[in-house]
Swiss-Prot record:
Transmembrane segments: none annotated. Belongs to the protease inhibitor I13 (potato type I serine protease inhibitor) family. Inhibits both subtilisin and chymotrypsin. Keywords: Protease inhibitor, Serine protease inhibitor. One of its GO terms (molecular function) is serine-type endopeptidase inhibitor activity. Disulfide bonds: none annotated. GO terms for biological process: response to wounding. The record marks M24, S25 as: Reactive bond for subtilisin. InterPro entries: Prot_inh_pot1, Prot_inh_pot1_sf. This is Subtilisin-chymotrypsin inhibitor CI-1C.
Amino acid sequence: YPEPTEGSIGASGAKTSWPEVVGMSAEKAKEIILRDKPNAQIEVIPVDAMVPLNFNPNRVFVLVHKATTVAZVSRVG
């Protein structure tokens, strides 16, 4: 499906993706995500790593290049 441009909003009205953090440092991305979703369990992982397949509505994956720069849209999951 197409990439969101302003972040997706889930059925509960909560934000579920953060396209605005692509290109930022992982630390800055975490700060922004936690502002929108204070209970988020943020996992910073390399873009080519395997991610768990079980869905967790409180988990947000931040996929990074070279362990510092956000590479893809961060999403709940």
